[in-house]
Swiss-Prot record:
Annotated EC: 6.3.2.13
Cofactor requirements of the protein: Mg(2+)
Family: Belongs to the MurCDEF family. MurE subfamily.
Residues annotated as binding ATP: 110-116
One annotated Gene Ontology cellular component of this protein: cytoplasm
Sequence motif Meso-diaminopimelate recognition motif, location on chain: 409-412
Protein name in the entry: UDP-N-acetylmuramoyl-L-alanyl-D-glutamate--2,6-diaminopimelate ligase
Encoding gene, per UniProt annotation: murE
Post-translational modification: Carboxylation is probably crucial for Mg(2+) binding and, consequently, for the gamma-phosphate positioning of ATP.
Length: 509
């Protein structure tokens, strides 16, 4: 594709050089540039792409899109724009043939519930006979193809290229998680969504966003800008959780017809006569397409909201109630979301991705409703991330758990012991007994807490003290199979660790 064709979609401020030059690829990482490539000099939080123009040129870049004309290279084609990220989004969509124009696209955003909702929407699509590709926190997948996801929502070039590949391989729909970072950085600005779904908004990512209003503002763009009906997709919808206070605001400002969902009597999609049990969720589903009983094997009130979100998305796509019911009642299993780990001791071991205060409380509420024995919770808080949620999560765990074991969770460049010290400030004032980890090897009676820097040791301790009827919750990492210490990533999987820990404690090691 010629550079002049790409330039037409970005309204450049200034251009220099031969715009008839052929472009063979788009890149925002100078290390990945290949011959004939167009490089985007993006300004980031920790680095500035303008500093890497020379490196990109050495690797074969023939042109650059930039914001700072004073950094423009001599003897190289360049295009100056006001927003390089927006330009990259538009150019990427054009370069890869506008892959979202011809298939239904469902975008799901919110603090919690995105991943489970994508799995449920995928199941509904499958029931309708529509093979759907899914892009999210766990993986990018379609059919037998599965690629681990480096980001919830990739940069716009990778996103458009991935969707192009999946559509070419036969995907007839796309279901994707849309992160606040992606919305803030315009990664999805050139995706044409048929349905935008809002799950909820609670504290998270305040290391990146200034405050909750900024966080909400990023999420809101999907509903106030990106789902507006247009000539390509004149019928679009916004599925919004109106029980959430931020969702209630979106209901009033969305630019597409709203399908509200929740438990309130005036929600367009709602559940009535709901019963929660160890077997799942049962009740009556009320939709604009009719009313019907339903049952799902998913557990807890928070998963009821995920189910309603998926139902609202199905309504937005115009799918029948029978199809929607068939999807949500199927065997939907989400890795690292209240995922059970088998053992021979009669202990219920659950691995969950809950890494925010709200998510942890939702999971622990569900666990406490199902528990017949004690609840032992192992969790930590990530380094180089929002520090404000650390004591909040500790207080929540202390409130619901009989024993809280605070440990590490991707400490990154922070000192693990320092993170744990901050976490403990939320549980120490509760007056619970503080155990030495070594004394817990003999078991415990009083409600309390302890800490271990090693997550491996923390999981082993939980396995040692648990008895039949107890529930052990390993929270924070879920599907992740790594631990980030410093700047290095090491293999670590809570599920594997739990299996080994219970096997070891069974044998008396």
């Amino acid at each position: 594709m010629r550079l002049e064709d790409l330039a037409r979609v970005v309204d450049p401020i200034a251009v220099r050089g031969d715009l008839t030059r052929e472009i063979n690829g788009l890149y925002c990482d100078s290390r990945q540039v290949r011959s004939g490539g167009l490089f985007f000099a993006l300004k980031g939080v920790a680095s500035d792409g303008h500093d890497f123009i020379a490196s990109a040129r050495e690797r074969g870049a023939v042109a650059v899109v930039l914001e700072d004309e004073t950094r423009a290279p001599c003897g190289m084609e360049w295009i100056r724009v006001g927003d390089a990220r927006l330009a990259m989004s538009r150019m990427a969509a054009l370069f890869y043939g506008q892959p979202t124009d011809g298939v239904p696209v469902v975008g799901i955003t919110g603090t919690n519930g995105k991943t489970t909702t994508t799995y449920l929407v995928e199941a509904i699509m499958s029931r309708a006979g529509i093979p759907a590709a899914v892009l999210g926190t766990i993986s990018y997948r379609f059919g037998s193809k599965l690629v681990p996801a480096p980001h919830t929502t990739p940069e716009s070039v990778e996103l458009q290229a991935t969707i192009r590949d999946l559509v070419d391989e036969g995907a007839k729909a796309v279901v994707m998680e849309v992160s606040s970072h992606a919305l803030e950085q315009r990664r999805v600005d050139s995706c044409r969504f048929d349905v935008a779904v809002f799950t909820n908004l609670t504290r998270d990512h305040l290391d990146y966003h200034r405050d909750m209003e900024s966080y909400f503002g990023s999420k809101a763009r999907l509903f106030t800008e990106l789902v507006a009906p247009d000539g390509v997709k004149p019928r679009r919808a916004a599925a919004i959780n109106r029980d959430d206070s931020y969702g209630a605001r979106l209901v009033e400002t969305a630019v597409a017809p709203v399908i509200s969902y929740g438990l309130a009597a005036d929600a367009a999609v709602r559940a009535e006569n709901v019963v929660f049990s160890v077997d799942g969720i049962a009740g009556t589903l009320v939709t604009p397409f009719g009313t019907a009983p339903f049952h799902s094997h998913l557990l807890g009130r928070f998963n009821l909201y995920n189910i309603l979100a998926a139902v609202a998305a199905g309504v937005g796509l115009g799918l029948s109630l029978d199809v929607i019911l068939g999807g949500i009642e199927g065997d939907v299993r989400v890795p690292g979301r209240l995922e059970r780990v088998h053992n021979e001791r009669g202990v219920t071991v659950l691995v969950d991705y809950a890494h925010t205060g709200d998510a942890l409380e939702n999971v622990l509420k569900t666990v406490s409703e199902l528990a017949t024995g004690r609840i032992i919770t192992v969790f930590g808080c990530g380094g180089d991330r929002d520090r404000g949620k650390r004591p909040v999560m500790a207080e929540i765990s202390g409130r619901y758990s009989h024993l809280t074991i605070v440990t590490s969770d991707n400490p990154r460049t922070e000192e693990p012991a320092a993170i744990i010290k901050e976490v403990l400030t939320g549980i120490i004032p509760m007056g619970l007994r503080e155990y030495d980890a070594r004394e817990l090897n003999r078991g415990f009676v009083e409600k309390g807490f302890t800490s271990l820097v090693s997550r491996h040791d923390a999981i082993r301790l939980a396995a040692t003290v648990a008895v039949a009827g107890d529930i052990v919750l390993l929270a924070g990492k879920g599907h992740e199979d790594y631990q980030i210490i410093g700047t290095e990533k090491f293999h670590f999987d809570d599920r594997e660790e739990a299996i080994a820990a219970f096997r070891s404690s069974d044998s008396g090691e």
